[in-house]
Amino acid sequence: MTTITLVQGDITRQHADALVNAANSSLLGGGGVDGAIHRRGGPAILAECRALRASRYGEGLPTGRAVATTAGDLDARWVIHTVGPVWSSTEDRSDLLASCYRESLRLAGELGARTVAFPALSTGVYRWPMGDAARIAVETVRTTPTAVEEVRFVLFDTHAYDTFARELGDAGHAGHAGHPG
């Protein structure tokens, strides 16, 4: 069974086999987690992303899909880039958000990753409500068969951490670590 833990902090400072990047479809960096991973990871990540764009994803990486690159200068073996959906009040896109977690876990398993660190996907500029995002993330990780031993949600602020902690507590699998207090 996969252990789920929470950490409040900067995902680019985590040690894990794979760090998940909340990428945009261009794979060329951006703001938030995406920009931070590209900045701290260095040029090797961008070079591999450019190669992926040139060879397989000329139109960009589709929402809900995941691809892996080197982790560059990050303390990880791989970065798994996934494109989350933009929140919509008129269309249910939760299956796409769940797909980001499932596809990232599938890819991590194929790579042989045992520890995977996720941010709260789609909750930044894509405006997904934190409570719903936490529910989808925790439920998807709990129900997705995987060889990954630890999934660590790395949450940038207290609001995100507390929301995920409530969701984990409600799910009966409270495994918390690293909350500043």
Curated annotation (Swiss-Prot):
InterPro entries: Macro_dom (IPR002589), Macro_dom-like (IPR043472). SUPFAM superfamilies: Macro domain-like. Residues 1-172 form the Macro domain. It comes from the Bacteria. It holds the Pfam family Macro. PANTHER family: GANGLIOSIDE INDUCED DIFFERENTIATION ASSOCIATED PROTEIN 2-RELATED, MACRO DOMAIN-CONTAINING PROTEIN. Belongs to the MacroD-type family. This is Macro domain-containing protein in sno 5'region.
